[in-house]
UniProtKB/Swiss-Prot annotation:
Post-translational modification (record): Ubiquitinated by ZNRF3, leading to its degradation by the proteasome.
Cystine crosslinks: C24-C85, C32-C78, C69-C106, C95-C129, C99-C123
UniProtKB keywords: Cell membrane, Cytoplasmic vesicle, Developmental protein, Disulfide bond, Endoplasmic reticulum, G-protein coupled receptor, Glycoprotein, Membrane, Neurogenesis, Receptor, Signal, Transducer, Transmembrane, Transmembrane helix, Ubl conjugation, Wnt signaling pathway
Domain comment as written in the entry: Lys-Thr-X-X-X-Trp motif interacts with the PDZ domain of Dvl (Disheveled) family members and is involved in the activation of the Wnt/beta-catenin signaling pathway.
FZ domain segment(s): 19-132
Identification of the protein by name: Frizzled-6
Compositional bias segments (type: Polar residues): 668-693
Family: Belongs to the G-protein coupled receptor Fz/Smo family.
All ranges on the Extracellular side of the membrane: 19-201, 255-284, 346-370, 438-473
SUPFAM superfamilies documented for this protein: Frizzled cysteine-rich domain
Amino acid sequence: MEMFTFLLTCVFLPFVRGHSLFTCEPITVPRCMKMAYNMTFFPNLMRHYDQSTAAVKMEPFLPLANLECSPNIETFLCKAFVPACTDQINVVPPCRKFCEKVYSDCKKLIDTFGMRWPEELECDRLQYCDETVPVTFDPHTQFLGPQKNTEQVQRDIGFWCPRHLKTSGGQGYKFLGIDQCAPPCPNMYFKSDELEFAKSFIGIVSIFCLCATLFTFLTFLIDVKRFRYPERPIIYYSVCYSIVSLMYFIGFLLGDRTACNKADEKLELGDTVVLGSQNKACTVLFMFLYFFTMAGTVWWVILTITWFLAAGRKWSCEAIEQKAVWFHAVAWGIPGFLTVMLLAMNKVEGDNISGVCFVGLYDLDASRYFVLLPLCLCVFVGLSLLLAGIISLNHVRQVIQHDGRNQEKLKKFMIRIGVFSGLYLVPLVTLLGCYVYEQVNRITWEITWVSDHCRQYHIPCPYQAKTETRPELALFMIKYLMTLIVGISAVFWVGSKKTCTEWAGFFKRNRKRDPISESRRVLQESCEFFLKHNSKVKHKKKHYKPSSHKLKVISKSMGTSTGATANHGTSAVAITNHDYLGQETLTEIQTSPETSVREVRADGASTPRSREQDCGEPASPAASSSRLCEEQADRKGRAGNGTDKISISESTRSEGRVTPKSDVTETGPMQSSSLQVPGSSEPGSLKGSTSLLVHSASGGRKEHGTGSHSDT
């Protein structure tokens, strides 16, 4: 059988890539082109019939050559896979002693990588040969250079990416300095039960923080005017952290489906962490999380700026509000620029603990320049402005130390600012401490992880791992807790009795009524009252005299009348805020246009015109409505033509009685008694006077025509 195989080889070998059975060919394998010989012969010991096949089969052993586990390993591999060929001796295989020396030097790495040593290269099968032959081992020393100590080479091995963590090219993956390599998923530091506990903890905290920040934002929506500058940035700050909490809650619901790549059994690839922006879902989570995290921090800095402008520079709320456009440009522009820069640099990384995607989880440089540095700058600037504002407020408190009430208010405000700032700064400074601690110890943790899994993954073990340290789960839980709890500090600012009252009114539907709507309601009720009452009066006219329902006005002068001449037009009747009866009565009867204006203003109405509209379009379609409005228009016309309103003196007050609102029945012109009170021509001259409506004790005089009437 062996003879038959040899004959077939002799027949078909010349047709395989131009190989000849008894001729040498130039070496084309790049790895072996630097050997002392430049001609080879095939088939080799492993029955490879061309150099391309031999080069492919030699690749699994190249890590031994790269690590230089033996100074002669590369020469041995080339002699085994690409044997030397000379004119005198067709094939020069590696010698047995040479094989034993190389194998003993590289045995540890062979076991580490889990390599399968070819049976054809077992040293027992090789022959002893004369090492003085020129084509053997001596010339090779000219190409290897100075030999290195095996133990010294082993210390410089470094990290080799395990086979199941390798990724396809073009994705930009890089793990522990090795390209096309990704971190394992689930997390490389913790066990499965620890990860489940951490995920549940993050989910609960995210829900709590989401509810707190939403409560702050909804409180703002209930009463927008309550939160003006300088405290308006608190609302935007709470909105940012509500989005951050929502992203962590979504990551809790998704688990590892977004932050990790699924295993590929065909390619023998395991679960790996997502690196880069190729995964759309992970990229979206990263954009929202990083953008609003940075924006929330910037809004806190803007809050300290507005406080400083108000306390230190004595800016008013309106002056600060004029700079709102610049505040928004900075608060949204800087995080947006950083987010776009990270996307362009392909620095998105999946977090297999929380389920979200962020930056700097495995790349220390990205964490240092895009997370740690911006947070440190914000803390420094915000704390400096905050201290400057508090010093200014303390100076103001010392100036007004004799004003006990204002000093107490200012003291409470300073305490409120201090507590709020502490609730924000303490978690943020703790978070910065976690990031700094992680920066210092990350390399040691990674070396320890490689040392723990090198035999399992068949990769070189790090000999420099003298002290093995592993991260504590509590450190990561504190980091996530401080990231989320920062947003809860906004609840302290809105937490007050006023907030409780607003929420109670919101749920009970007892909000404050609009003054304009309230005045319209009063006018509508007045018109409805006149409609009902006027119909009764018309019905009773058959039985009563016209003068029996006449009303008279008593004007009690407070000594403010300065006019010297009598007013032959309509006299102005002033209404004070304390005379509610006079306000309601005069509003209903509208004696003159001037009094109508005053009365409508006192009741919160806009103009007499709106009142005429309410009367012109009553809710009831009865015929009495039109008659009422006609009579009111007629009365105003007569008043404008010169009808005088006559007041009864203080001495006759005992002869009358105060008329309630329901007793007003007559819509005709007012009749006077025998006394006249001189009025001023200026409307403001009667300010402070009090008006009362009484029935005449002695009956009214007969009405005159529509012409002018003057009293003597």
